[in-house]
């Protein structure tokens, strides 16, 4: 922990209620401090830290009464110590400082303990107690309900990752706990599944059971469909099975995946799984987005390892964080296990680019986008088994905005032959190409009318390309 002494404008200092352990500031104490300041008494500098959300602001760790007193006497600049906490919890640091002159009240201690645990469930009762001046037993009582809720939530997250056969070591790393802790939680899994299966056996529907137990619906489907073959699973989900190479659906099945830019239909993923994988195969999803692939793998009894640059450990623990750096492209997992099927559904160049992270590949130039894909295909090839198949989903990109069809050029466009060329250059050979058109609903009547008058051709083509290693 570092400390830097300096003087800063008082307007740059904020009292952040999120890390202030007291219920209120004492006007009497502020007035006393202000009087001492006027009389020339030396006052200890206020302790602050750089505000996590505003680079030009500081928030108070210790000295809220002194700060108010400085404001009362009209000070414009005040002496401070800027503290670098190096991972220490700011609320607990502030609480430990606050109990120096006066112990926290019972209400303040309880509130601070609960807020600290909600912010960081890895904190022990001993650590919290040391900061707020209370015994471990007292803290246990303060946070008992929060701890129980956290344990239930952790059980469900572990069950979710375990259902997709993510190794315990990676689960432990995901949640910041010991692998032994994961093993202990896994012992509860049969009982959790039994409760859900009991309700299913009583005739409750999958949505009803999911809502009752707080499970994601795809996880309930994984139990409801246990022991069934893929065709039976299609029937249970009320999905027809297409036996031709045109895969078009009017809408995504909202039971699978989150509301996400560029969301793909779960029905499409189910068809890919049916034709190009078997139950218990390992599916690798390098750009998971809203989690459609993982959810569909639950319903079709496939193992699934998913990765994405958007890290959502609370809502999507099974999607592990991964940023594909074009300057240093690395496979996100180590070990001998290699996937049976890779489903690669990246952003379709500039489509939806306004809804994606600007640091992602949709923010790249055409040349860099294709360069990234070629590097990824080569990396996937070197991390695949001889029998591994890859599915590449993408769409034509044409710069057709305000451009009549006969005036279009290939300068900015990316078409299927561009993708096929770099796939072949990277050691992959296509075996099937499915048409999976994008919805044309985004072309509203007035837009269509304008396009017709200007002789503009829009893009709805999307391809599902199935590949094997050469």
Protein language model annotation of sequence segments:
Residues 158-176, 181-470:
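Class I S-adenosyl-L-methionine-dependent methyltransferase catalytic core
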Residues 7-18, 91-94, 246-252, 351-358:
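Short, basic/glycine-rich phosphate-binding loops at helix/coil junctions
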Residues 5, 62, 119-121, 163, ...:
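Helix-turn-helix/winged-helix DNA-binding modules
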Residues 1-83, 252:
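Short, charged/polar connector segments at secondary-structure boundaries
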Residues 17-34, 68-164, 189:
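Amphipathic, charge-rich alpha-helical segments that serve as recognition/docking helices
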Residues 54-56, 152, 461:
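Exposed loop/turn and edge beta-strand positions of beta-sandwich/beta-sheet ligand-binding modules
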Residues 21, 65-66, 101, 302, ...:
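Short, cationic motifs built from Arg/Lys/His that form the positively charged side of catalytic pockets
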Residues 62-65, 108, 264:
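A generic structural signal for residues located within well-ordered alpha-helices
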């Amino acid at each position: 922990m570092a400390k830097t002494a300096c003087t800063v404008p008082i307007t740059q200092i904020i009292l952040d209620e999120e890390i202030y352990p007291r219920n209120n500031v004492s006007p009497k104490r502020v007035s006393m401090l202000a009087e001492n300041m006027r009389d020339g008494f030396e006052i200890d500098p206020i302790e602050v830290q750089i505000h996590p959300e505003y680079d030009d602001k500081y928030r108070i760790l210790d000295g809220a009464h002194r700060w108010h007193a400085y404001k009362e006497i009209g000070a414009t600049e005040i002496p401070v110590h800027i503290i670098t906490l190096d991972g220490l919890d700011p609320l607990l640091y502030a609480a430990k400082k606050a109990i120096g002159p006066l112990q926290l009240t019972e209400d303040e201690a309880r509130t601070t303990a609960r807020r600290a645990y909600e912010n960081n469930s890895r904190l022990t009762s001993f650590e919290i107690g040391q900061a707020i001046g209370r015994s471990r037993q007292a803290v246990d009582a303060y946070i008992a309900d929060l701890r129980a809720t956290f344990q239930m939530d952790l059980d469900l997250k572990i069950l979710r990752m375990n259902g997709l056969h993510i190794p315990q070591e990676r689960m432990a790393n995901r949640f910041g706990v010991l692998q032994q802790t994961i093993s202990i939680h896994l012992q509860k899994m049969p009982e959790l599944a039994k409760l859900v299966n009991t309700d299913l056996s009583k005739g409750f529907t999958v949505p009803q059971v999911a809502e009752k137990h707080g499970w994601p619906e795809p996880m309930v489907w994984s139990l409801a469909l246990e022991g069934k073959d893929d065709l039976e699973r299609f029937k249970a989900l009320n999905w027809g099975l297409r036996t031709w190479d045109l895969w078009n659906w009017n809408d995504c099945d909202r039971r699978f995946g989150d509301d996400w830019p560029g969301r793909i239909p779960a029905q499409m993923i189910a068809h890919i799984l049916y034709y190009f994988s078997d139950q218990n195969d390992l599916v690798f999803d390098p750009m998971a987005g809203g989690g459609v692939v993982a959810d569909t793998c639950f319903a079709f009894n496939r193992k699934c390892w998913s990765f994405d640059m958007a890290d959502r450990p609370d809502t999507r623990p099974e999607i592990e964080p991964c940023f594909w750096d074009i300057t240093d492209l690395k496979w996100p997992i180590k070990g001998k296990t290699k996937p049976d099927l890779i489903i690669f559904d990246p952003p379709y160049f500039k489509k939806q680019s306004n809804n994606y992270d600007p640091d992602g590949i949709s923010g790249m130039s055409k040349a860099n986008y294709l360069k990234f894909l070629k590097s990824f295909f080569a990396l996937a090839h070197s991390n695949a088994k001889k029998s591994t198949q890859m599915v590449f989903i993408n769409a034509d990109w044409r710069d057709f905005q305000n451009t009549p069809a006969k005036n279009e050029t290939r300068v900015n466009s990316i078409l299927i032959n561009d993708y096929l060329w770099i796939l072949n250059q990277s050691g992959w050979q296509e075996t099937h190409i499915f048409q999976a058109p994008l919805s044309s609903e985004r072309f509203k009547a007035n837009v269509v009318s304008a396009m017709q008058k200007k002789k503009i051709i829009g893009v709805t083509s999307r391809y599902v390309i199935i590949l094997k290693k050469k």
